[in-house]
Amino acid sequence: MKILRKLLFWLIVVPVLLVLLLQLYFFLQIGWWVNHNPGSTSFMRHQLSILQEKNPKAQLKHKWIPYNRISNNLKRAIIASEDSNFSEHEGVDWDALQKAYEKNIKKGKVVAGGSTITQQLAKNLFLSGDRSYLRKGQEVIITYMLEYWMDKERIFEIYLNVVEWGVGIFGAEAAAQHYYGVSAAQLGAPQAARLAVMLPNPRFYDGHRGTAYLARRTDLILRRMNSAALP
């Protein structure tokens, strides 16, 4: 029986404790970021390591700028494109998740996530790019931690500064400079709409900027963005 108890301890209790400690780390780290800007994210570090495998001197293009120095055009375009209910939900849009789940069942694999802006931020800050229901569950937990600690404006500010916008391009300022040679504060509505549309697949659109889909989707977001509610 002693051997069985020890076995159960190592197989069940220890893994559970490790998972709880990991959640505590996430919780405290998010609390720190309420008043301190993250210098990088898990996803940024992962992408940098990939770039440096080909070029050891490779660096990311990234510059943090305050929320009030980012064009409202870009904020509205991203909300219109990525998460129209951002200002209203509590971090998770369960209707969108249900639709994604049904799509995944139909396809027989995970092809859609139904993620909100807060969920995307949770993934970028801490998680890998793998698609699995286990990772999705962790994403939801971190999402609620973000919503517990931060108001919507702070969540959106961090998102705008760390989201990927191309090969080695992270954040609104780097994206504005990379694609248009202007600061994020100077982005016009058409520029902002195009940047927003790139977000689901930024590395692809970095190299394929003239696709018909990008043009059609940009026109759609231009029509929708004025009604997007900012936090």
UniProtKB/Swiss-Prot annotation:
**Which leading EC class covers this enzyme?**
transferase
Task: Tell me where it resides.
Answer: Cell inner membrane
Q: What catalytic reaction does the record list? A: [GlcNAc-(1->4)-Mur2Ac(oyl-L-Ala-gamma-D-Glu-L-Lys-D-Ala-D-Ala)](n)-di-trans,octa-cis-undecaprenyl diphosphate + beta-D-GlcNAc-(1->4)-Mur2Ac(oyl-L-Ala-gamma-D-Glu-L-Lys-D-Ala-D-Ala)-di-trans,octa-cis-undecaprenyl diphosphate = [GlcNAc-(1->4)-Mur2Ac(oyl-L-Ala-gamma-D-Glu-L-Lys-D-Ala-D-Ala)](n+1)-di-trans,octa-cis-undecaprenyl diphosphate + di-trans,octa-cis-undecaprenyl diphosphate + H(+)
Print the keywords alphabetically. Answer: Cell inner membrane, Cell membrane, Cell shape, Cell wall biogenesis/degradation, Glycosyltransferase, Membrane, Peptidoglycan synthesis, Transferase, Transmembrane, Transmembrane helix
SUPFAM superfamilies the UniProt entry points to: Lysozyme-like
Q: In which pathway does it act?
A: Cell wall biogenesis; peptidoglycan biosynthesis
What EC number(s) does the entry state? 2.4.99.28
State a single Gene Ontology molecular function. peptidoglycan glycosyltransferase activity
List the Pfam families hit by this protein, alphabetically.
Transgly
Q: Which residues cross the membrane?
A: 7-27
The similarity comment for this entry is: Belongs to the glycosyltransferase 51 family.
Q: What does this protein do?
A: Peptidoglycan polymerase that catalyzes glycan chain elongation from lipid-linked precursors.
Q: What is this protein called?
A: Biosynthetic peptidoglycan transglycosylase
The organism of origin for this protein: Janthinobacterium sp. (strain Marseille) (Minibacterium massiliensis)
User: Which gene produces this protein?
Assistant: mtgA
